[in-house]
């Protein structure tokens, strides 16, 4: 799916509804320096999936976001990304403020509640009595919120409502 600003593409993992979504989870390759799309009324979280970090400047404040680390910002924010060590990918959660709620955590062990799991590195998860091995970038949808056990690896676990 093309970015709103036309500067890249994301690969949708899940969303609520049609084109007027309430929440959306996607994996996006970031291959060059440039601005993020301005999305008024949308809260955003992203987690870097690859070893190459992402340098983000959010409303004038710059920080380096490494593999498995998160950046959160409002869709109205002025955000510019740089790829100081080459292309990388991020897993992003976008939630329409006031219409839905959502959160994303990074987990390497333990049990967590979630609806969507995206592997950052090769990972083994347990859900609904079964084990699943996920390659980097693989995702699984658990349906309604359920307990997800992370046996090994590093994953993004997303909880959204409705």
Residue map of PLM features:
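Jelly-roll (double-stranded beta-helix
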Residues: 1-162
């Amino acid at each position: 799916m093309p970015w709103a600003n036309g500067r890249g593409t994301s690969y949708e993992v899940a969303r609520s509804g049609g084109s007027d979504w309430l929440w959306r989870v996607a994996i996006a390759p970031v291959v060059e320096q440039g601005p993020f799309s301005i999305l008024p009324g949308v809260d955003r979280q992203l987690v870097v999936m690859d070893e190459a970090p992402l340098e983000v400047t959010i409303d004038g404040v710059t920080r380096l976001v490494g593999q498995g680390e998160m950046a959160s910002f409002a869709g109205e924010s002025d955000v510019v990304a740089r790829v100081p060590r080459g292309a990388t990918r991020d897993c992003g959660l976008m939630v329409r403020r006031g219409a839905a709620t959502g959160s994303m955590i990074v987990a390497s062990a333990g049990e967590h509640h979630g609806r969507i799991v995206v592997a950052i590195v090769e990972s083994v998860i347990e859900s609904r009595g079964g084990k699943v091995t996920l390659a980097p970038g693989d995702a699984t949808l658990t349906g309604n919120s359920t307990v997800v056990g992370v046996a090994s690896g590093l994953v993004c676990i997303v909880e959204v409502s409705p």
